[in-house]
Amino acid sequence: MLAEGLAVGDKIATGKVRVIPNVSHIRDFRPGEILVTDITDPDWEPIMKNAAAIITNRGGRTSHAAIVSRELGIPAIVGTGNITRAVKTGQTVTVSCCEGEAGRVYDGELKYRVDKMDVSAMARPHTKIMMNVGNPEMAFKQAAIPNDGVGLARMEFIFANWVQVHPLALTRYHSLPAEVQQQVDAVTAGYSDKVEFFVDKLAQGIGTIAAAFYPKPVILRLSDFKTNEYAHLVGGNRFEPEEANPMLGWRGASRYYHPDYREGFALEVKAIKRVREEYGLTNLLVMVPFCRTPEEGQQVLDVMAEEGLPRSKDGLEVYVMAEIPSNILLAADFSQIFDGFSIGSNDLTQLVLGVDRDSSQVASLFDERNQAVRQSCADLIRTAQQYGRKVGICGQAPSDYPEFAAFLVKEGIDSISLNPDAVLRTTKLILEIEEKAETVLA
């Protein structure tokens, strides 16, 4: 064994290693290789989708590499500590995520067995089993997996790969320096209207996901880049502040109504309107991330209405992510303005326990199964039910820990949204849990 870290998913892969020291060298990567690096961020996504597997020195189960690899359905091992020193480019290795919580990297090509499952006769549980989706190019393939819709459609992949340009670099194109205008021109070639480029590309990406799962509900999370991630988009560094802690900074709901970004958010709204009204995909619903207070939530809804996308129009439901302790403590107030909640267990665990989810040093303390996190989820479910609001979960916890999924089902959660690679095994588990519960009641 060459290295060990946290397993992401439950698959296994073999291939040749490509050690990439930083994002400036991603052009060296070849499809089918095993990507080895220190840590990833959205700038790496163009090559991640072509990797046989991903291994990083740093990061936890909710790091960027972990989240993206789950959505892509490829194995990943994060937080190995020294993988960039333990292997060399061109070396053949086996990446195993099928041995429990620990992921292991072995030298050479090991033999393994593939188990297949016939899903044609699989029953549907009472709890809705939804899916986390981010890459439109994978949407139709993933839609073939038995599901009840998309509980989390991530917009960030479309931003980074289909749009690539910061929204304000398009709305304020004429104020940009000549060299930045040239970069924007290169990306937007074929579009005379820079704003139309953004709306069209974003609508195409969102619409592809909504179409793949139609008529099942697709809950789209509004953009949730942090400032350092927005800054990596073309022209982005001219519009984003440098923050000491972007994870807790200007992100999510706080951006949408702010005078420094409202015009950028308006473009998102235009794209959503196009998908719902022009494409006719009214199964597309909306979710507001990182909403700190009910007052902030109302401000976001007001901006959406001003831009022609009011809640309830043509059946539009608007959900809020429950990922901040205030979302739990003030759930009754949030219930007055939103149609439901989706628990973001990644950030909720981080903020309830005070643990940096991306730090390898405290990775052992980041545990969604902690009683404080479980109690927060249980309290939210009860409050949501009291006010007649739907509540689901779209964080990593149910995908990683079957016992956490079982806990949520017993608490009466309405839906569980999973990474594609966890849908079938978790569906089987939930069917068993519900069957046992019905037997006891009988």
At which residue positions do the language-model features occur?
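Acidic, glycine-rich flexible loop/linker segments
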Residues: L2-A153, F157-H174
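Conserved alpha/beta-domain cores
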Residues: M117-A442
